[in-house]
Amino acid sequence: MMNKRKRVEELGETKHRQVRQRILQEHKNDILENLAFELSDKVRRLRSNASLLASTIRMRGEMRIAAIPRAQRNMHLRDLKNHLSCNVSATPWRTKIKEFYNLDELSSQKSARQPTKTVASSSSSSSKSTTVSKSSSKSQV
């Protein structure tokens, strides 16, 4: 048989138990309040970090979108594939500039003219200057 503990019902012991329980309950309440405060603080910090991360991710996405030309932003994948399969080496704004200034024609004309002009003009100007100087020296004598 098990020996059961006898209950002592003295006034001192019952008061001691009640006081002890009251302190424990107050202590539990304090611990719960501290825990609630710590949790709310942690939630606040996590939310602020999450909003910061969300804003940086949003900014990165906007930067990536800004890198795509406006004409290609609404294209379907097949259209983009067709566009990229064409061997277009120059970007659209460069082709527009070339069309406006006709750079291909100007560059071919300049390359055809410049070497002959510089060679001919430099040799003829030097010969003219020598002939002029000879004739002027003869007239003075």
UniProtKB/Swiss-Prot annotation:
Where is the sequence biased in composition, kind Low complexity? 116-141
The UniProt annotation puts the region (Disordered) at 106-141
InterPro entries attached here? Answer: Borealin_N (IPR018851)
Localization, UniProt: Nucleus
**Chief location of this protein within or outside the cell:** nucleus
Q: Polar residues composition bias: which ranges? A: 106-115
GO biological process terms, semicolon-separated: meiotic cell cycle; mitotic sister chromatid segregation
Domain of life where this protein originates: Eukaryota
Keywords noted in UniProt: Meiosis, Nucleus
State any GO CC term: kinetochore
Described purpose of this protein according to its UniProt entry: Has a role in meiosis.
Q: Mind telling me what this protein is named?
A: Meiotically up-regulated gene 118 protein
Q: Which organism is it from?
A: Schizosaccharomyces pombe (strain 972 / ATCC 24843) (Fission yeast)
